[in-house]
Curated annotation (Swiss-Prot):
It is found in: Cytoplasm. It comes from Shewanella sp. (strain W3-18-1). Mg(2+) 1 binds at residues 12, 50, 72. Its cofactor is Mg(2+). This is Ribonuclease H. Residues 3-144 form the RNase H type-1 domain. The gene is rnhA. The lineage of its organism: Bacteria, Pseudomonadati, Pseudomonadota, Gammaproteobacteria, Alteromonadales.
């Protein structure tokens, strides 16, 4: 059996105004090679961008991989590691019996994460972590670039 490739992924989301223009930034490292991705949306939220970044990164992988995914978003990390199990059992409802926010993205993240073996890591934002800082710049730049793309799942 072939060993899965080990990919290091760093992600961040940004939103100006929250809601407002937003963007995500991704840095991917594999065997000394680095790939960066970013994109912006006209109207979204910070949490949606924090979720979309790992989705886009994981969906870009062409085969099942071992992934170390690092983000400064406790919302994303806690959600995918802990909360999602209860939400799925309750039909995507919270413990307060309200619909889970950003359910479209949570479902996408759940689906794509099952294809890979993922170590979900958290890093404190704006604390000098090089890849996280780079993701922050990419995400903020995408949000500031007057994006016109529509975040179809955003519901104010």
């Amino acid at each position: 059996m072939t060993e899965r490739k080990l990919i290091h992924i760093f992600t961040d989301g940004s939103c100006l105004g929250n809601p407002g223009p937003g963007g995500y930034g991704i840095v991917m490292n594999y065997k000394g090679h680095t790939k960066e991705m970013s994109d912006g949306f006209a109207l979204t939220t910070n949490n949606r961008m924090e979720l979309l970044a790992p989705i886009i990164a994981l969906e870009s992988l062409k085969e099942p991989c071992r992934v170390v995914l690092t983000s400064d978003s406790q919302y994303m990390r806690q959600g995918i590691m802990t909360w999602i199990h209860g939400w799925k059992k309750k039909g995507w409802m919270t413990s307060n019996r309200t619909p889970v926010k950003n359910v479209d993205l949570w479902k996408r993240l759940d689906k794509v994460s099952q294809m890979h073996t993922i170590d979900w890591q958290w890093v404190k934002g704006h604390a000098g972590h090089a890849e996280n800082e780079r993701c922050d710049i990419l995400a903020r730049s995408a949000a500031e670039a007057n994006p016109t793309q529509i975040d179809e799942g955003y519901q104010p």
